[in-house]
Amino acid sequence: MAQGKGFGFGLGKIKELQEAFQKAQQVQEGAKVLQEELERMEIPGKSADGLVTVLMSGNQEPLSIEIDPSALEKGAEGLSASVTEAMKAAYAESTETMRSKMEELTSGLNLPGM
């Protein structure tokens, strides 16, 4: 190997590598905190008629379903439609919340592809 020639890892590259590791560690620590935060969230979703409310965690885990007694008058098909609407609404809100929180976590880190 010629004098002064290395493996292409000059001081600048080592500094970049250290910064990349630090960013990865920040994201890992932040992701753990975020995961715990999302687990504690209770995100509601309602049916269009307002008779069914679904609570879902920030991790899209269904937590509970509240059904107004008058929803039973809609019959099985109508009730099923209301529950499905409420589930979809809660899921959409939960995934949007998760996406938004992930953006907050990674903003300013200049991560490729994020």
From Swiss-Prot:
Q: Where in the cell is it found?
A: Cytoplasm, Nucleoid
Alphabetic keyword roster:
Cytoplasm, DNA-binding
- GO CC annotations, alphabetized: bacterial nucleoid; cytosol
Q: Which HAMAP family match?
A: DNA_YbaB_EbfC
Function (record text): Binds to DNA and alters its conformation. May be involved in regulation of gene expression, nucleoid organization and DNA protection.
Family designation: Belongs to the YbaB/EbfC family.
Q: Which PANTHER family match?
A: NUCLEOID-ASSOCIATED PROTEIN YBAB
Q: How does it assemble?
A: Homodimer.
Q: What is this protein called?
A: Nucleoid-associated protein slr1847
Protein source organism: Synechocystis sp. (strain ATCC 27184 / PCC 6803 / Kazusa)
Q: What is the lineage of its organism?
A: Bacteria, Bacillati, Cyanobacteriota, Cyanophyceae, Synechococcales
